């Protein structure tokens, strides 16, 4: 596993963004783990988060793209910090763009978007925290495609939970790929998280022991993507 992936897994744990225990998700599912991407709140956390996204995007998509698009609301800071990190790490100036929840009807920046305007010929990488249902893409892709003649290169999320999406068979990222045709990737998958943390001591404790691993296995037996 790449070094940046290992570091990102530990970063999620240290930031208390990825937690293990007993949780009830919005869907009503009982889950042995929970991710709250809103837990990144400090300057140093956001700086590191942008760097991990930049590493993963460069790893999967290279630098042949023009715009990072982050859907409102959580995608706005993600697109900003990742554009900064990409410039610093790879020397490539990438523009950021996000949509507004409500269209602004006045001022120099009026319209449906924040940041850079999308232009014909732009190659766009979309960025989100986590995709569990693909619903946000149903709203976002038509907006992006309708703004200009652009090509969506791919989507990057922080964690692939590897759970079935709306179709009940494939994970949400695969469903998005099948529906729209562009690549979908995550900085890490839950499989990689488990591989890195299972029965390994980290900062004086074993985060995923045999008991928790059994609970995770049972969860994926019921809800895991095929």
Describe every region a protein language model picked out.
Residues 1-127, 132-226:
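PRPP-associated nucleotide enzymes
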């Amino acid at each position: 596993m790449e070094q940046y992936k290992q570091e990102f897994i530990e970063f999620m744990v240290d930031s208390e963004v990825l937690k293990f225990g007993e949780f009830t998700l919005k869907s009503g599912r009982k889950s042995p783990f929970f991710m709250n991407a809103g837990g990144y709140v400090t300057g140093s956390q956001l700086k590191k988060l942008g760097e991990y996204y930049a590493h993963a995007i460069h790893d999967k998509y290279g630098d042949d793209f023009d715009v990072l698009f982050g859907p409102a609301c959580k995608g706005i800071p993600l697109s900003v910090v990742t554009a900064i990190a990409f410039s610093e790490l790879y020397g490539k100036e990438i523009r950021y763009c996000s949509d507004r929840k409500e269209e602004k009807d006045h001022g120099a920046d009026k319209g449906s978007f924040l940041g850079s305007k999308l232009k014909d010929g732009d190659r766009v990488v979309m960025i989100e925290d986590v995709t569990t249902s693909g619903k946000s893409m149903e709203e976002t892709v038509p907006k992006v495609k309708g703004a200009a003649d652009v090509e969506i290169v791919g989507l990057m999320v922080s964690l692939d939970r590897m759970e079935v999406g709306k179709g009940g068979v494939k994970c949400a990222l695969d469903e998005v790929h099948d529906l729209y045709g562009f690549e979908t990737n995550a900085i890490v998958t839950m499989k990689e998280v488990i591989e890195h943390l299972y029965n390994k001591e980290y900062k004086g404790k074993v985060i995923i022991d045999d008991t928790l691993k059994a609970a995770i296995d049972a969860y994926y037996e019921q809800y895991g993507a095929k």
